[in-house]
Curated annotation (Swiss-Prot):
Similarity comment text for this entry: Belongs to the metallo-dependent hydrolases superfamily. Uronate isomerase family.
Name this protein carries in UniProt: Uronate isomerase
HAMAP family attached to this UniProt entry: UxaC
InterPro entries according to UniProt: Metal_Hydrolase, Uronate_isomerase
Any one of the GO BP annotations: D-glucuronate catabolic process
Source species taxonomy: Bacteria, Pseudomonadati, Pseudomonadota, Gammaproteobacteria, Enterobacterales
Pathway in which this enzyme or protein is active: Carbohydrate metabolism; pentose and glucuronate interconversion
Organism: Escherichia coli (strain K12)
Molecular functions per Gene Ontology: glucuronate isomerase activity
Length: 470
């Protein structure tokens, strides 16, 4: 019987153990996509307690707690921090088989140093007190944890209208060497069907000093904000494409669509597709000219529970996997961007694992001369960010493309404790390659495979995003 979560956790061959301990474990972290609040990094936030750093805002945990019958007041409601933590501690023993069980105990181990102890109601007091004592120390502040975890770069997720004042404050602080850069997330600028679109256009017009009436005005406003982001070191964009759409339109049609929407009219699905296509093609060309990377997160079915959406708002754990086809529209969108050779470096993520092979083959259609891995099939996302999901994504990438050119893991998280997801990914990567070697499917060449592992863990992302590190 193998003990739970030893130093060789998941490393079930000797070759995997060598790969992990000698090549993967000590690689720095290049976390190119996350949702950390830049203000907390700028002010070097001190966490009040274990709830504050671990449960607050974590919709993964809330979903598990609801499934365990926990009352909503103990998830997102007015219960005390300790009551919410106790509700989580009572849920954890029921999460065996869910990645939350592994994540929980990896996060207790690093950075808190708690090993050989499982979170449950019987250990809740001890773990709460021990972690809170550590959180009072300087090296457990927001910056302190990032430094402990050997982070070199994080890319936050930021709206085009954001001032980026906190990024500027961080950049001026020469004592803090981790790169904290904004990522451009323009969803509100192209989701023309949303009720909030007109208000957003007013805000975008205000910050860009542009009166947005025609499509060219929107392009001008977005270009000004792209320049603002570039001035703060941005090299990455991200887009939530819940449904991939494609429909072409001329400028007169786009002007009409925008004008009618600003006048409060409801658009047809075809008109929505025309507008979204035009914005994405325009933005893609801008990214290509600037050497940016674009990311498409495809296939979420959001806000399914309308009652809870009205009570609690979005992003609180009521989203799931969509099953709408995407291949043809995605192909047309990428091909349109590529017509003038202005398809930027692109990472494609799918939420439905059914679409893994769709993306794994799609990227091969648009690779770039002289640019290894220009088109990337992104790491297992959200519901696929677990052992089976990562294995599936990497196996299919290896079979359909070049795993060796993969830019690897990202946390996509709102928590400063989520850096152990990089460790989890690295262990799974080494386990997978070790099994290939054990089965005679890959050569037992530690130098060849060790270098490949180092590249996937850090070097490929560093080179792909072309961000100068401190």
């Amino acid at each position: 019987m193998t003990p739970f979560m030893t130093e060789d956790f998941l490393l079930d061959t000797e070759f995997a153990r060598r790969l992990y301990h000698d090549y993967a474990k000590d690689q720095p972290i290049f976390d190119y996509h996350c949702h950390l609040p830049p203000q907390q990094i700028a002010e070097d936030y001190r966490f009040k307690n274990l709830y504050d750093i671990w449960l607050k805002g974590d919709h993964y945990k809330w979903r598990a707690m609801r499934t365990n019958g926990v009352a909503e007041r103990l998830c997102t409601g007015d219960a005390s921090d300790r009551e919410k933590f106790d509700a989580w501690a009572a849920t954890v023993p029921h999460t065996i088989g869910n990645p939350l069980y592994h994540w929980t105990h990896l996060e207790l181990r690093r950075p808190f140093g708690i090993t050989g102890k499982l979170l449950s109601p019987s250990t809740a007091d001890e773990i709460w007190n021990e972690c809170n004592e550590l959180l009072a120390q300087d090296n457990f502040s927001a910056r302190g944890i990032m430094q402990q975890m050997n982070v070199k770069m994080v890319g936050t997720t930021d709206d085009p209208i954001d001032s980026l004042e906190h990024h500027a404050e961080i950049a001026k602080d020469g004592s803090f060497t981790i790169k904290v850069l904004p990522s451009w997330r323009p969803d509100k600028a192209f989701n023309i069907e949303q009720a909030t679109f007109n208000d957003y256009m007013a805000k975008l017009g205000e910050v860009s000093d542009t009166d947005i009436r025609r499509f060219a005005d929107l392009q001008t406003a977005l270009t000004k904000r792209l320049d603002h982001f570039a001035a703060h070191g941005c090299k990455v964009s991200d887009h939530a494409l819940d449904v991939v759409m494609f429909a072409e339109a001329n400028e007169a049609e786009l002007d009409s669509i925008l004008a009618r929407r600003l006048a409060g009219e409801t658009l047809s699905e075809h008109e929505v597709a025309q507008f979204k296509t035009a914005v994405l093609v325009f933005l893609g060309a801008e990214y290509a000219r600037r050497g940016w990377v674009q990311q498409y997160h495809i296939g979420a079915l959001r806000n399914n529970n309308l009652r809870q959406f009205k009570l609690l708002g979005p992003d609180v754990g009521f989203d799931s996997i969509n099953d709408r086809p995407m291949a043809e529209e995605l192909s047309k969108l990428l091909s349109k961007q590529n017509e003038e050779n202005l398809l930027p470096k692109t990472i494609l993520y799918c939420l439905n694992p059914r679409d893994n092979e769709v993306l794994g083959t799609m990227i091969g259609n648009f690779q770039g001369e002289g640019m290894p891995g220009k088109m990337q099939f992104g790491s297992g996302w959200w519901f696929n960010d677990q052992k089976d999901g990562m294995e599936r994504q990497m196996t299919q990438l290896a079979q359909l493309g070049l795993l060796s050119r993969f830019v690897g893991m990202l946390t996509d998280s709102r928590s400063f404790l989520s850096y152990t997801r990089h460790e989890y990914f690295r262990r799974i990567l080494c386990q997978m390659i070790g099994r290939w070697v054990e089965a005679g499917e890959a050569p037992a060449d530690i130098n060849l495979l060790g270098e490949m592992v180092k590249n996937i863990c850090f070097n490929n992302a560093r080179d792909y995003f072309a961000i100068e590190l401190n």
